[in-house]
Design a protein with these regions (language model features):
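Hydrophobic transmembrane alpha-helical segments in integral membrane proteins
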Residues: 1-25
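Hydrophobic cores of alpha-helical transmembrane segments in multi-pass inner/ER membrane proteins
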Residues: 20-30, 77-91, 138-150, 183-199
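Membrane-interfacial loop-to-transmembrane alpha-helix junctions, especially the N-terminal start
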Residues: 40-50, 99-106, 151-162
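Aromatic-anchored segments of alpha-helical transmembrane domains
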Residues: 51-59, 109-120, 162-174, 227-233
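Membrane-proximal helix-loop-helix units in multi-pass membrane proteins
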Residues: 68-145
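Loop-to-transmembrane alpha-helix initiation sites
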Residues: 70-75, 175-189
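Internal/C-terminal transmembrane anchor helices
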Residues: 211-234
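Conserved small/polar residues in nucleotide/adenosyl-binding loops
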Residues: 244-248
Length: 248
């Protein structure tokens, strides 16, 4: 755990000006997608997301977090997502068109990366040894929000990668004492339902076994089970923090 937090501190101390620039670029591009969703803006967002995932792979994991175990594997994970966005730039699968989903939840996910440092400060942490907006889980939350707000067609590879990363984030809640990462895990439950509900609705006319109504019911059940699991994890973390506070 000491290595984990030391690498975060070194990363934040060395890259905080770049992180501010990245957050500003993300905000500008997101606003442009709402106000002026031209093809150039959409391509710029895909390039930005490819670069952002590459930043996490190279700068975060390989340069500043190389001391951690399996950092090369995690760098490969984010590198693959960067390649997927670059391929999407060529294939134009993700159109970044406004969806019929409520944008309130997407807006909440946009703001969650900014909440990461606030949660760290509330826990008594201080800069640079704290979570920041340009870290793996906060980037994943922002990407999920973007896809919920703008993507009609689901890029299933990105969805699977991001959901898998949410499970990794949940593990970090236990092993590294980062309750902030529960934000990503918790946001995945409604996001999963919204993603796959639309997929089921689009294929409602197809004859499948089970049928669309049964699939929707199974999806709701799955999300409830995952939500209960995440809730149990959060309660366990709160109990551990309470025991630590009492012992002090």
């Amino acid at each position: 755990m000491e290595i984990f937090w030391n690498t975060i501190a070194r990363y934040n101390a060395a890259t905080w000006p770049w992180q501010i620039a990245i957050v500003a670029a993300a905000a500008v591009l997101t606003v442009l997608l709402y106000l002026r969703p031209t093809q150039n803006v959409k391509r710029a967002m895909k390039l930005f997301l490819a670069g952002l995932n590459a930043w996490i792979a190279v700068v975060y994991y390989l340069v500043w977090c190389g001391q951690r175990s399996h950092s090369d594997v995690l760098a490969l994970f984010w590198g693959i997502m960067a390649v997927i966005w670059l391929y999407d730039l060529y294939a134009d699968f993700t159109r970044f068109e406004r969806t019929s989903r409520p944008n309130g939840f997407a807006l909440l996910l946009y703001l969650m990366p900014l909440a990461y440092p606030l949660f760290s400060l509330a826990r008594g942490l201080s800069f640079p040894m704290m979570t920041m907006p340009v870290m793996p889980c906060s980037v994943a939350v922002f990407t999920i929000g973007l896809m919920l707000a703008f993507t009609h067609r689901i890029n299933i590879f990105l969805v699977l990668f991001l959901c898998h990363w949410a499970l990794i984030g949940l593990a970090k809640v236990y092993f590294f004492g980062i309750p902030e990462d529960f934000l990503l895990a918790a946001s995945t439950v409604p996001a999963l339902y919204l993603f796959f509900r639309e997929y089921i609705a689009k294929n409602r006319e197809l004859r499948t076994k089970p049928d669309a109504r049964m699939l929707n019911g199974l999806l709701i059940l799955l999300c409830i089970v995952i939500g209960l699991f995440f809730t149990a994890t959060l309660l366990h973390q709160i109990r551990l923090l309470s025991l630590i506070h009492i012992s002090e």
